[in-house]
Amino acid sequence: QGAVGAFMSMAAGYGIKPANILAAVRPIAERGAWEKAASKFERMPQFGLDIETWTALRYVVDGWRAAHPSIVQGWWDMQDAVIAAVETPGEFVRMLGGRIRFFCARDRRFLHMYLPSGRVLSYFQPRIVEPKRKDEDTDEAEAAQDHNDRRRVVVEGRDSKRGGKWGKISLYGGLEWENAVQALCRDLLADGMLACEEAGYPVVLHVHDEP
């Protein structure tokens, strides 16, 4: 769900510099789509990039989103469901025909996500906050600015992006989907490992991650 900031993080992981993306994208960019991407520069986190380089990254992001509208809508549906659950403590909020459910305790100490397996992910101290300011160079700020300054839910916990320090974590839709997919992959792996062992195939090594 992150845009330019997330794209930069991914590119860095592969040793790709933003300037190289600009060089590859600019000559083949469709004019209207390029101008539309560039028009977002002033109101979005800029991550220290000049407008041309920023626009090149945003152009790629916009193109991917246009090609995958169901995924994009899924981010916002998830974010809306989380907000609805916190706004209506004591009631279930359902997604995907009830395969994923959210429930916020009446005292609002915990928000629970019920997975298809029946396992539960719990988030401490959920509360609704206003969008981050556009001058904050974070994925959360970018996600908020990217969809009409939507509200979001924050919780408390150990933040892997800050070295595991305790603090506030933004539960925007993309992160909730990441949590759900990671947890689902773990459930599939655990079930498969037990099935293999029962069939006479001992498990000697295993790993799981988001596909």
Which residue ranges define each predicted feature?
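Electropositive nucleic-acid-contacting surfaces
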Residues: 1-173
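Active-site lining segments that contact anionic ligands and/or coordinate catalytic metals
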Residues: 108-110, 118, 200-201, 207-210
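Active-site palm subdomain of RNA-directed nucleic acid polymerases
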Residues: 18-20, 188-208
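Conserved pre-motif C helix in the palm subdomain of viral-like polymerases
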Residues: 174-194
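Glycine- and acidic
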Residues: 169-179, 206-211
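Acidic/histidine-rich catalytic cores and adjacent linkers
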Residues: 154-156, 162, 180-184, 198
